[in-house]
Amino acid sequence: METQFRRGGLGCSPASIKRKKKREDSGDFGLQVSTMFSEDDFQSTERAPYGPQLQWSQDLPRVQVFREQANLEDRSPRRTQRITGGEQVLWGPITQIFPTVRPADLTRVIMPLEQRSQHCKPEEGLQAQEEDLGLVGAQALQAEEQEAAFFSSTLNVGTLEELPAAESPSPPQSPQEESFSPTAMDAIFGSLSDEGSGSQEKEGPSTSPDLIDPESFSQDILHDKIIDLVHLLLRKYRVKGLITKAEMLGSVIKNYEDYFPEIFREASVCMQLLFGIDVKEVDPTSHSYVLVTSLNLSYDGIQCNEQSMPKSGLLIIVLGVIFMEGNCIPEEVMWEVLSIMGVYAGREHFLFGEPKRLLTQNWVQEKYLVYRQVPGTDPACYEFLWGPRAHAETSKMKVLEYIANANGRDPTSYPSLYEDALREEGEGV
């Protein structure tokens, strides 16, 4: 499928990208990302051209995917003709398609537990985060707090019954625990809502008006349990060991056994969507689980000689973006999409290292990506495609199912992508 991209006479430098980037391919989906909006743009409820109403959060980009016709002979699409006759479109913030988690929560996941008691107080922690994040990251962190009530969370605790308030969050203690240290908190990976849909907890007697609201306290406890379980699962993945329900209950859940299903489910979702790790049951009798990379990928990006984090989650996102963009995406568009999640070319990320080197060198050497010059461009512009190893280990259908699952939808909700995936499977047979 030929890739179409409107450059609008601009160079290929990210600094020259227009506010709205369009890219269409013949009869398939195009992606429009609007990144710079004024505050007034988000004050009222907007209606998508062919979709439901959504209340847009302030200062967040939005994504509109629609059918358009493009000129196959060059990279300048013809005047678009939008299809309105029953064609379902994807209209929503890109952060609702791909997973996002707050830096403060990631710090809790990757920080050695034995250092937590020495960690700074909440007020000091926020100040330290802002210093580490820098101006851009601190602004994003502040925006995250404002957006928390709007976006559906990767760790959405949902509606719960009353939680026991006697126990405070107690992280698992292990003298042999492996540490995961971030290189820098200079990027923000989206937003995670601390708010569930509201628990119906009965408020007990209070001896002080300054005590924390029981409902918020219960939600915080549950949230802490989820994060601690993610930490435990990451350690088990690194040593390629099995984990049992009994171990999770004894190390993390403790007095909250009644809420194990919710905690385990949300921790598993976080592992899959953020780190690209699936938690699979191998023995229903003993409730034993194994942790494996998602989508049959044999790569996780963890180096034997360093305390790095799994990178297969980001790889799946990159493969998904390429697929959604018509199987080929200009480099500057890729970085614009990833920047929405706090991943910037040339800026060290506390989970993924230096992203540009990761995409243009490491994953090219691993044959997951093809990074090539766009023919006839001067100055040279580059684009990304799936590499042979990506085609061999996974498929468009599996990536589409991943995207649909992250968005809470069925793969058939994306007709053109679904047809493309089916066509690939048919050719494979």
From Swiss-Prot:
Database matches in SMART domains: MAGE, MAGE_N
Subcellular location(s) per record: Nucleus; Cytoplasm
Protein origin, superkingdom: Eukaryota
GO cellular component: cytosol; nuclear body; nucleoplasm; nucleus
Cytoplasm in keyword set: yes
PROSITE patterns xrefs: MAGE (PS50838)
Keywords, comma-separated and alphabetical: Cytoplasm, Nucleus, Tumor antigen
Segments of skewed composition (Polar residues): 194-209
Tissue expression per record: Expressed in tumors of several types, such as melanoma, head and neck squamous cell carcinoma, lung carcinoma and breast carcinoma. Expressed in testis, ovary, prostate, cancerous prostate, breast and adrenal tissue.
InterPro entries (alphabetical): MAGE, MAGE_N, MAGE_WH1, MAGE_WH2, MHD_dom
Protein source organism: Homo sapiens
Gene3D superfamilies for this protein: MAGE homology domain, winged helix WH1 motif, MAGE homology domain, winged helix WH2 motif
Span of domain MAGE: 222-421
Single Gene Ontology BP annotation: negative regulation of transcription by RNA polymerase II
Effect of residue 57 to P: Found in a family with intellectual disability; uncertain significance
Chain's role: Acts as androgen receptor coregulator that increases androgen receptor activity by modulating the receptors interdomain interaction. May play a role in embryonal development and tumor transformation or aspects of tumor progression.
Start and end residues of each stretch annotated as Disordered: 1-30, 188-215
Protein name: Melanoma-associated antigen 11
